[in-house]
Amino acid sequence: MNQIRQAPAASASNATESKQEIRNYTMNFGPQHPAAHGVLRLILEMDGETVVRADPHIGLLHRGTEKLAESKPFNQSIGYMDRLDYVSMMCNEHAYVRAIETLIGIQAPERAQYIRTMFDEITRILNHLMWLGSNALDLGAMAVMLYAFREREELMDVYEAISGARMHAAYYRPGGVYRDLPDTMPKYKQSRWHKGKALKRLNAAREGSMLDFLEHFTDTFPQRIDEYETLLTDNRIWKQRTVGVGVIEPDVAKAWGMTGVMLRGSGIAWDLRKKQPYAKYDAVDFDIPLGTCGDCYDRYLCRVAEMRESNRIIKQCVQWLKVNPGQVMVENFKVAPPKRESMKDDMEALIHHFKLFSEGYCVPAGETYSAVEAPKGEFGCYLISDGANKPFRVHLRAPGFAHLSSMDAVVRGYMLADVVAMIGTYDLVFGEVDR
C-alpha cells in the first residue's frame, strides 16, 4: 500500500530508465471507525503496515462541562458529572460531591459512606464488563460481549432501583446520598422472551431487598468471571493479539501521568483506595492486582482481577449495611433537603425544598482538590469557591486525557492491526477526555 511515484528522467540518455521513491502514507483512523470508541480521530503515518507516528485529534465531543458547572449552583451540577465518563457514572459524582463537602466542612454519615463505597465498586464492575466485551469484540471475539452484558444488565437494574435511571443516576449528594437502599427489586414481567421456568429463575433473587439481591450476585459473580476467562485467558488467538503488544515501561507510565490499570499493569502499586483512602475503603479488605510485563494482556488480567476484588468489597459492604441501619444524609439543613413527608403538610419545608434546589447554597471561600480511584484511573475535581452559590472555577482531571496523550509514544513501531488492541486497552470514553 506504499505510495509510489515515478521520478522524472535525469537526462535524455537514460530517459527510458525510471527511479522509484517509496515514501510513507497517512491514514485517518476514526472518528467513524467502530474501534475508535467514540469520536477519536487518530492520524497515522504508516510505513507499509508499521506505524511511524500517531497524532490523536480530540475535541469532537467537547461540551464545555467545566464552564457549565461554573454557571449553576453547586448542587445543580451533579448531573453533569454522570455525563463525563458515562460508563463510570457514580465515581464521577463522588469526586465532585467530596470536593463540595471539603469546602463546606461536612462529612457524610457512616452508612452513606458504605453505600458510596459499594456503588463505586458496582460502577467499577459495570465499566470493566463494558470494556471486556467491547475490547474482545474489537479483536474478533464476539461471544464475550454477550456474556458480559448478562451480568451488566443485573447491575444496571440496581442502578435503576436506587435512582430511577439506568445510567445517569445523580444519586450522590453533598452530605450523603439521595435515599436509603430500597426494600424491593424490580422484577421481570412475563413476555415472549421471559416466561415459564426461565421467568421464575430470573426473579428468584429479586424476591427480597436490594441487599439480598446483591448478596446473591456476589455469590454467583466469581463463577461468571471464570466463564469470561475460559473464553479469553488461554485463548491462543487472544494471546497472539495482546501479549507483547502495547508494552509500557514503568518509567514511561509515570512520565505520562498514567493512573489506574494503565499504571498498575506496568507493575506500579498506586491505587488511591489504598494510598489515600476515602469513603470506607480503609475498613474493607482487598488487594491491588499488578501486571509484570506492561502489555495489553497484563492490563486485561488486571481488569479481570479487579472485578474479583470489587466483588469482595461489595460483599463486605452488604454484610455491614444489613446489620447497621442509620442516616444516609447529614442533618444540616443548609445542604440537606427536608423529608418528603414533611413537605405534604408543612409550608416552611416546601419553601425550604424549593429554595434549596432553585438557588442552592453558598459555599465558604476556598479551594480544594478531591480525587477518587475511578475505573479508568484517577478522576479528580479541582474546585474554587469565592463564597457565592456557584463555583468560581471547576477543573476536572480526566484519566483518559493523560492516557491518550501517550498514544504516539506507545504505538510507534507496532502494526496497524495492533493499534485497535492498544486503543481498546486504554479504555477511552470521550465524554471525559473532551469534557
Swiss-Prot record:
Taxonomic superkingdom: Bacteria
Membrane topology: Peripheral membrane protein
Catalytic reaction(s) noted: a quinone + NADH + 5 H(+)(in) = a quinol + NAD(+) + 4 H(+)(out)
Top-rank EC class of the record's enzyme: translocase
Major localization class: membrane
GO (cellular component) term, any one: plasma membrane
PROSITE patterns given in the database record: COMPLEX1_49K
GO MF terms, alphabetically ordered: NAD binding; NADH:ubiquinone reductase (non-electrogenic) activity; quinone binding
Family membership noted in the UniProt record: Belongs to the complex I 49 kDa subunit family.
The protein, known as: NADH-quinone oxidoreductase subunit D
Organism: Xylella fastidiosa (strain M12)
